[in-house]
Every structure is written in structure tokens, then in C-alpha cells.
UniProtKB/Swiss-Prot annotation:
The keyword Isomerase applies. This is D-mannose isomerase. It comes from Thermobifida fusca. Optimum pH is around 8.0. Stable between pH 4 and 11. GO terms for molecular function: isomerase activity. GO terms for biological process: carbohydrate metabolic process. Optimum temperature is 60 degrees Celsius. Signal peptide: none annotated. The active site is at H251 (proton donor/acceptor), H383 (proton donor/acceptor). Significantly inhibited by divalent metal ions such as Cu(2+), Cd(2+) or Ca(2+). It is an enzyme of class 5 (isomerase).
Length: 407
């Protein structure tokens, strides 16, 4: 079977889609404070203010685009770096606020591991891209993470603190730690410091090999401060965008991909990384893809595999595409090519918005954009953009590291 990625037309399609996503994200440029939340047509939503995670993701994508030689991307990356070094950073207690309002006033002063993971990711990618101030930002973010979030005794990270770092939240989460794996791998590529790869391995070992594997690859997302599973967390807010109840199908796929990146970072990787990656992928497909009579991935499952939230999120199919591309490259197994083609067809048919730009972020169970839902507008291009880049890159700990080897 000839891989789609070996065909010039497919590679050109991926490149064109990547450029389209970068162009859409460029409209989020807030003059002073970072990157705004965009509505469905790509216009900033002032009422949403500026979120640190969105600013970081656009900065990361812009740094990758600059590494690829896309004119104008460097200015976007530099704008994001200035915002992260300036208004989004706490000048009194250090660390990064969660959000500002449209005037630049702090709207959410919490210090979250999720936000800090993306600060580190953006800074690391921009460091590889050679952007001014990026390495200083990376070092600052790394210091805060090491001092406030990293638990050396457990090998994973706390969730969040108040603004002054006095009280940490009595909750631990898989989502933030998963993104810290990604950020730590990017920091390893940017600095060469192996401690980041070793920490990524420790986090992955706990969540995948210790928690998911004994549960037949069903990954609980929510934990007590001493890392006991809280199975009924958010039963009253099951579609929460960051902490939904039950098993999040897209995260199972994302972990499958990240395990391969962890493997690429280690000189002598343990064999369980690839074995667990393939098992996580297979479980997500069997339990999450078209299981309710309609094409697509459901958002969440109960622990008996019953669909809970049947909405289709754009980031889930994007992560599925990325996982299929990475595992296909790693193993050479044609099953992954089948799924890679299937999910790009699905994404192009239902999610890619060729009229207003970017991707629909959410579809209802009939595959139509809902009037309301978990997500409003189109704030994020990060998952979709990475799905267009990973299929064309060699395996590496991070996207920036991979681009640096082919640039």
C-alpha cells in the first residue's frame, strides 16, 4: 500500500491546510495582551478576554510555522512571547495568570499546571525557532514548574494554586500532566537536558502503565491529592471542557501518540512504551469510534464503555489522525494507514470549515454544529495544525525538534 504521505497531492493538501490554519489564528492577535478567543468566523470575542493557554498555543504554532519558513510567522511568535513575558505573567508572585479581560486586567489569577505546561511548550518551541527572549521564558517557566508543581517523590505534578502560592487545589488531574509530558519533551529538545525526558517518562508510566493498563486501557482523569482515583468526579458537569466525567476518548489517543514521542527521547526506552501506545490506540478506536450509530468519536465514555457525552470534538479526530500517523511511521503496520485515511476523510467532510475558516470545534451527535455546546467559537488551531505536520515529520520528542532536523 502506498502511503498517502508518499503522494505529492496529499502532502500539498496538508501544507495548504496548515497555512490556512495559521492565517486564521493570526486574526487572534491582541494589540497588547496576547491572543484573543475567536468566534466562528475568526473575529475576536472581547468578552472572552485573553487566555494564557490560547496565547501559548498560538505562539507554539507560530514558532513551528517559522521553523518551516512561513513568512510572517515570526512576528506572531514574538508577539506571543512578549505577552507571556509581560501582562500574562504575575509581577508580584511570579508564574502565569490563567486569563485577562479585554482591558488587560487579571480576570483569573489562579496558577494552573495546565497553563504553565503551555507556557513551557511555547517557550521551548520558540527557543528551537531562535526567537528572542524565548530561552529566558523557557528558563523562567521551568523554574516555576520545578518549584511549584513538580512532585519529585511521586514523579508527577500538582494541579493548581491560588495567586500567591499559598494553597494548592485538593485535586490532581491527568489532563494537565499529559500536557506536561508534551511540554517536558519540548523542553528536552530545546535544552538537551535529559531530566525533562526522564520526568516525561515518569508521568507517562503512572497514568498509562500503572493506572490505565490494569483497567484495560480505560484511563480515569481525576485524582485526590494522594493520587487515588475519584471515579465520580464531575458527574454533574459531564461535558466539562477540561475535566469531564469518565474516560475522555481523545486523551486516550493523545497518550498513545505521546508514548511514541517519549520513546524517541530515550537512549534505551522500555518496551512497554510502544506496547502500551498500541493498546491505548486500539482501545480508543474500539470503544470511541462510531459506537452510537453515527460516524465519529464520542467525547466521553462511562467506565463500562457506554457513551456519556456524544458530541464530536474537533480536537479528538485531530489527535486520532496524529496518533495514526505516528504509530504508522513507528510500526509500519498498514492498519494505521487505514485509520489515517478514514479520519482525514471524516475531518475534511465534517470539521474543516472552508467557508468561515479553521475547523468547527464541536458537532452534535447528528454531525451538525450545535447552537450552543461545550465550546463557543474557534479559539484553537493547535490540535488541527499538529495533525497536518506530524504525518510529514520524522519521529522526535517534539514537533519543533523534528522540524529542526529537517530544516
Amino acid at each position: 500500500m502506498t502511503l498517502w504521505t508518499a503522494r505529492a497531492a496529499h502532502r500539498a493538501w496538508l501544507d495548504a491546510e496548515a497555512r490556512r490554519l495559521v492565517d486564521f489564528a493570526a486574526a487572534a492577535d491582541h494589540p497588547e495582551h496576547g491572543f484573543a478567543w475567536l468566534d466562528g468566523s475568526g473575529a475576536p470575542l472581547p468578552e472572552q478576554g485573553v487566555h494564557t493557554w490560547i496565547t501559548c498555543r498560538v505562539t507554539h504554532v507560530a514558532a513551528l510555522a517559522h521553523l518551516e519558513g512561513i513568512p510572517g510567522a515570526s512576528a506572531l511568535a514574538d508577539h506571543g512571547l512578549r505577552a507571556l513575558a509581560g501582562p500574562l505573567r504575575d509581577p508580584e508572585h511570579d508564574g502565569w495568570f490563567t486569563a485577562l479581560d479585554s482591558r488587560g486586567t487579571v480576570a483569573d489569577s489562579r496558577k494552573e499546571a495546565y497553563q504553565h505546561a503551555f507556557v513551557l511548550l511555547a517557550a521551548a518551541s520558540a527557543t528551537v525557532a531562535g526567537r528572542p527572549g524565548a530561552r529566558e521564558l523557557l528558563d523562567a517557566a521551568a523554574a516555576v514548574i520545578e518549584q511549584r508543581f513538580w512532585e519529585e517523590e511521586t514523579g508527577r505534578c500538582r494541579e493548581s494554586w491560588d495567586a500567591a502560592w499559598h494553597a494548592d487545589e485538593p485535586y490532581r488531574g491527568a489532563n494537565s500532566n499529559m500536557h506536561l509530558v508534551e511540554a517536558f519533551l519540548a523542553a528536552f529538545d530545546a535544552t538537551g537536558d535529559r531530566v525533562w525526558a526522564e520526568r516525561a517518562l515518569r508521568i507517562a508510566h503512572f497514568f498509562v502503565h500503572e493506572v490505565a493498563a490494569p483497567r484495560d486501557w480505560r484511563l480515569p482523569e481525576h485524582f485526590t491529592p494522594d493520587w487515588q482515583v475519584v471515579a465520580d468526579y464531575n458527574t454533574d458537569d459531564r461535558a466539562h471542557p477540561f475535566r469531564p466525567y469518565g474516560v475522555t476518548v481523545g486523551h486516550v489517543l493523545e497518550w498513545a501518540r505521546l508514548l511514541v514521542h517519549v520513546e524517541a527521547a530515550l537512549p534505551d526506552p522500555p518496551s512497554w512504551l510502544l506496547a502500551d501506545a498500541e493498546a491505548m490506540f486500539a482501545a480508543a478506536v474500539a470503544r470511541g469510534w462510531s459506537v452510537d450509530g453515527t460516524e465519529g468519536f464520542v467525547y466521553t465514555l462511562d467506565y463500562d464503555d457506554t457513551p456519556v457525552v456524544r458530541s464530536r470534538m474537533h480536537w479528538v479526530v485531530a489527535e486520532a489522525i496524529s496518533a495514526a500517523a505516528v504509530l504508522g511511521q513507528r510500526t509500519g503496520d498498514e492498519r494505521y494507514e487505514h485509520w489515517y485515511r478514514t479520519w482525514w476523510d471524516h475531518a475534511a467532510t465534517y470539521f474543516v470549515d472552508t467557508v468561515q475558516g479553521s475547523w468547527h470545534h464541536e458537532l452534535d451527535p447528528t454531525l451538525a454544529p450545535p447552537p450552543g455546546g461545550t465550546w463557543s467559537g474557534k479559539p484553537d488551531v493547535y490540535h488541527a495544525y499538529q495533525a497536518t505536520r506530524l504525518p510529514l515529520l520524522p519521529l522526535a520528542p517534539s514537533l519543533a525538534g523534528a522540524l529542526a532536523t529537517v530544516g
